[in-house]
Curated annotation (Swiss-Prot):
It comes from the Bacteria. Part of the 30S ribosomal subunit. Contacts proteins S8 and S17. May interact with IF1 in the 30S initiation complex. GO terms for cellular component: small ribosomal subunit. One of its GO terms (molecular function) is structural constituent of ribosome. The gene is rpsL. InterPro entries: NA-bd_OB-fold, Ribosomal_uS12, Ribosomal_uS12_bac. Residues 1-30 are annotated as: Disordered. This is Small ribosomal subunit protein uS12. Residues 9-21 have a biased composition (Basic residues).
Length: 123
């Protein structure tokens, strides 16, 4: 433990809190271009083929982002908008792709929670 004299000379530094989605640079969303679209498997207790895309952002960073919902139309060179938010069972996936924006189509035949998946109101 430091002495009072040491604390006077060099006071305690507050801990710096880092953002969980640093590559967005304090923006709510960022635009990017898909460089690779593929599926990956989740961590131990779960089993699935999760759809993810590697995205090069406008600020130059490359991030892995999750494609939510059933079916998608993304391929290489698709322009997408990403938001923060990790996927708990996919290590390294800290971003989500927004559906129904730019080149990404909304989820077809979606009836509940439509706004989260960019789906229009069914007639």
């Amino acid at each position: 433990m430091p002495t009072i004299q040491q604390l006077i000379r060099k006071p305690r530094q507050p801990k710096v809190q880092r953002s969980k989605s640093q590559h967005l640079q304090s923006c709510p969303q960022k635009r990017g271009v898909c460089t690779r679209v593929y599926t990956t498997t989740p961590k131990k207790p779960n089993s699935a083929m999760r759809k993810v895309a590697k995205v090069r952002l406008t600020n130059g960073f490359e991030v892995i982002s999750y494609i939510p919902g059933e079916k998608h139309n993304l391929q290489e060179h698709s322009v997408v908008l990403i938001r923060g938010g990790r996927v708990k069972d996919l290590p390294g996936v800290r971003y989500h792709i927004l559906r129904g924006v730019l080149d990404t189509q909304g989820v077809k035949d979606r009836r509940q929670r439509r706004s989260k998946y960019g789906a229009k109101r069914p007639k």
